[in-house]
């Protein structure tokens, strides 16, 4: 094994790891970086603690762990183990854990210091999956703030060194030349007049006739794999096995595809891009590359993912071709013109730029980061995708302002997709928990093709679903409980309320509660039902309507009875074009779907406004335009009543405001004739109208919205209902302030969140004088080294404040 190419750079790599917290390793496929190097690092005395090896794909993780254990003459679970969703194989003596991406994130969240871990290896980092980017950001944060002794090795076959070196300029780069046999690369564009499946099958069969050895065929997705397999079956001899390989196959079926062909047989492995890098497939010397891939692109406008078939990057073509030269000289046939291949993008677009970021945002909030820009990213998450993620988390009740709510914290602790996590934590008893766990297991690994009825899938006892649901129940700390199909609809409705659907035609078309269209095959048995919940949707490429992949038929009356919180009641006035008059209607709605309509007598202006006020009372104050300024004014009034009770402050709790809408809101509703118009109202001014001029002055004086710090900066005070008021300010701007600022006639000290020059929290205190005299010394010592260009005086209480560095002070 020491003849492996990566062995030649082992001394250089070990020296780099001894000297630097992060090291970059570029080593082509087959160099031994996954299946040999980790054991050498395990034996290195400079690595103190366990090694965590991240593999992006489950099959690769298990295979790598199996191979590493074999080299030690052991089984997985001894020195080498693995962890992945629904499968753990580790023991008390395990020192090297091979894990998949989500598992690593959970490990970091549960133990931010990664206690007992000396080295984390990110393998196949060039794939730039969303979870790998998140893991890198979290690990760099851990190194910076908690574990400066933790080592990080980032390795890949086609490492984007330029980008990584810009982000990690001090990280040594170790390059292994690798070892591969020459691969003859041929190009053959597919005939325009021939069906894709037929043309690929013909080209593959011809390659098998001309050349010896087994063949790896790259296709965009499962549909193409199944169709090309069918076409190939009639074009090849009995000595050729056809083996599909894609992510949704069971691990056992995937393993069959990578094992050697039986004696005297050849095989064709029909694979998606799962086979590009991390898997060793025995006996391959021929590659046929269709030069296409299917990628998921998230649409933040609809909240849905669209599958796009596109040309692969040049890096992917190189990787695919390289599979033919792992064991002997090989041939790679790219089904594309050479000129087109040369015009392809150099690298694939990272997932973080085109994915649903709701899970990432929830992970960051659990980490304590409300602003993703504070983390280190190779590519910043798109703002529009983050806003869509925030909207979803708000809908699921996971947010409280800019932080996770109590429910959001429970959701984040599970590590599931946010919708599934919301469903799981909503379970009120063991039976509901068992039902939610089984639904989550099905939606995580849905049945491929076939029946779209979730109820039918729920009735099946598929082992993988059973195993996964048991794992989820363990996380929920639930023992016992029976999965009950009658509980599916209300559980789904809580997490997928926007995907409740009502039929709008006889051809399988539906409207969703969020206003979007969706479609079932007209021959699907579910399409006969008026109401569905469709948790699994895919944005169509040829139609604006989403495609329903999995749905549950619903008795809407029963659902409304069991989940009254889903229904909004609104009184509206509409023109009746036929009569030329106004008519009033009371609608019971779920989102944009009307459940029931009842006519009302023609209202007067006063009746219209009263109906609107009733609508506000039914829906709650959230239908109003609560700007941050209005929210803070309300909190100031709530706090004033507690801190200065001797004055007659108006009550502004929900119940009181709803009861007094006629007093404070109605005077501002002139000309407002719709619920939409309510959104244009200035709630800040409406609330200030509750105070006379004298009380307004008292509020602004005693509980000001801003505090002027010694530098003259006016900084917003953050008021909270149950916590002291807080002021986040850079420490240098508070120099010269000897005592802690107070408000409310000196009764309430401000909580000072003293920030570093980079706006990171350094200290939280309610006693500034005590801090200057005590804990400041430790902060000063650390910050002088980290921010030498900034002022860190010995006597901050008597030093002039500044916003600037020493150069300008």
Curated annotation (Swiss-Prot):
This is ATP-dependent RNA helicase HrpB. ATP binds at residues 27-34. A motif (DEFH box) lies at residues 123-126. Residues 14-177 form the Helicase ATP-binding domain. It comes from the Bacteria. Keywords: ATP-binding, Helicase, Hydrolase, Nucleotide-binding. Residues 195-368 form the Helicase C-terminal domain. GO terms for molecular function: ATP binding; ATP hydrolysis activity; ribonucleoside triphosphate phosphatase activity; RNA helicase activity; single-stranded RNA binding. SMART domains: DEXDc, HA2, HELICc. Its EC number is 3.6.4.13. Residues 788-809 are annotated as: Disordered. Belongs to the DEAD box helicase family. Pfam families: CON_HrpB, DEAD, Helicase_C, HrpB_C. It catalyses: ATP + H2O = ADP + phosphate + H(+). PROSITE patterns: HELICASE_ATP_BIND_1 (PS51192), HELICASE_CTER (PS51194).
């Amino acid at each position: 094994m020491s003849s492996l190419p990566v062995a030649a750079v082992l001394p250089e790599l070990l020296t780099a790891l001894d000297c630097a917290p992060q090291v970059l390793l570029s080593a082509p496929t087959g160099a031994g970086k996954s299946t040999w190097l980790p054991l050498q690092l395990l034996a290195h005395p400079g690595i103190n603690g366990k090694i965590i090896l991240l593999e992006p794909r489950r099959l690769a993780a298990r295979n790598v762990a199996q191979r590493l254990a074999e080299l030690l003459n052991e089984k997985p679970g001894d020195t080498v183990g693995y962890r992945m969703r629904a499968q753990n194989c580790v023991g008390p003596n395990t020192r090297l854990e091979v894990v998949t991406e989500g598992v690593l994130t959970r490990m970091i969240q549960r133990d931010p210091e990664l206690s007992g871990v000396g080295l984390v290896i990110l393998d196949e980092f060039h794939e730039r999956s969303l979870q790998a980017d998140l893991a890198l950001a979290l690990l760099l944060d851990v190194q910076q703030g908690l574990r400066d002794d933790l080592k990080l090795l980032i390795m890949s076959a086609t490492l984007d060194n330029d980008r990584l070196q810009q982000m990690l300029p001090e990280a040594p780069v170790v390059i292994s030349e690798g070892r591969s046999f020459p691969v003859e690369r041929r190009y053959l564009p597919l005939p325009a007049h021939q069906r894709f499946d037929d043309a690929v099958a013909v080209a593959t069969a011809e390659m098998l006739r001309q050349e010896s050895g087994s063949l790896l065929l790259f296709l965009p997705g499962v549909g193409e794999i199944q169709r090309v397999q069918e076409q190939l079956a009639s074009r090849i001899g009995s000595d050729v096995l056809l083996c599909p390989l894609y992510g949704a196959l069971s691990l056992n079926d995937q393993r069959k595809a990578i094992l050697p062909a039986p004696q005297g047989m050849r095989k064709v492995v029909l694979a998606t891009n799962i086979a590009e890098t991390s898997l060793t497939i025995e006996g391959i010397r021929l590659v046929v590359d269709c030069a296409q891939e299917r990628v998921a692109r998230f649409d933040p406008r609809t909240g849905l993912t669209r599958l796009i078939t596109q040309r692969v990057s040049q890096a992917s073509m190189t990787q695919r071709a390289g599979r033919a030269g792992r064991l002997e000289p090989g041939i790679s046939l790219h089904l594309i013109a050479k000129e087109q291949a040369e015009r392809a993008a150099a690298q694939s677009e990272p997932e973080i730029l085109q994915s649903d970021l709701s899970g990432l945002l929830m992970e960051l909030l659990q980490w304590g980061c409300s602003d993703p820009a504070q983390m280190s990213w190779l590519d910043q998450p798109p703002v529009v995708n983050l806003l869509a993620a925030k909207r979803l988390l708000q809908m699921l009740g996971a947010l409280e302002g800019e932080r996770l709510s109590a429910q959001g914290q429970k959701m984040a602790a599970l590590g599931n997709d946010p919708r599934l996590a919301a469903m799981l934590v909503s379970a009120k008893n063991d039976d509901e928990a068992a039902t939610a766990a089984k639904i989550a297991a099905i939606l995580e690994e849905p049945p491929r093709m076939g029946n779209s009825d979730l109820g039918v899938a729920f009735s099946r006892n598929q082992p993988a679903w059973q195993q996964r649901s048991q794992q989820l129940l363990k996380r929920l700390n639930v023992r016992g409980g029976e999965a009950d199909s009658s509980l599916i609809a209300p559980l789904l409705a809580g997490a997928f309320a926007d995907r409740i659907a009502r039929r709008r035609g006889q051809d399988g078309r539906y409207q969703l509660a969020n206003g979007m269209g969706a479609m079932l095959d007209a021959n699907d048995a579910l399409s006969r039902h008026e109401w569905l919940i469709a948790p699994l949707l895919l944005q169509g490429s040829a139609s604006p309507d989403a495609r329903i992949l999995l749905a549950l038929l619903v008795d809407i009356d029963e659902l409304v009875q069991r989940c009254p919180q889903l229904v909004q009641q609104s009184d509206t006035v509409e023109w009746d074009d036929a009569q030329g008059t106004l008519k009033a209607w009371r609608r019971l709605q779920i989102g944009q779907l009307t459940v029931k309509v009842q006519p009302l007598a023609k209202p007067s202006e006063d009746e219209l406004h009263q109906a609107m006020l009733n609508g506000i009372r039914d829906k709650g104050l959230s239908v109003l335009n609560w700007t941050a300024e209005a929210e803070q004014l309300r909190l100031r009034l709530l706090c004033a009543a507690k801190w200065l009770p001797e004055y007659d402050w108006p009550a502004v709790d929900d119940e009181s405001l709803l009861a007094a809408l006629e007093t404070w809101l109605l005077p501002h509703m002139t000309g407002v004739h719709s619920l939409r118009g309510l959104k244009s109202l200035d709630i800040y001014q409406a609330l200030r109208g509750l105070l006379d001029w004298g009380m307004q002055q008292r509020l602004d004086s005693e509980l000001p919205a801003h505090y002027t710090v010694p530098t003259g900066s006016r900084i917003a005070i953050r008021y909270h209902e149950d916590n002291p008021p807080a002021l986040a300010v850079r420490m240098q701007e508070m120099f010269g302030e000897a005592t802690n600022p107070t408000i409310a006639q000196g009764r309430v000290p401000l909580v000072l969140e003293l920030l570093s020059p980079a706006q990171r929290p350094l200290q939280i205190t309610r006693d500034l004088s005590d801090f200057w005299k005590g804990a400041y010394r430790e902060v000063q010592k650390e910050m002088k080294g980290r921010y030498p260009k900034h002022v860190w005086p010995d006597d901050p209480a008597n030093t002039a404040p500044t916003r600037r560095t020493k150069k300008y002070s």
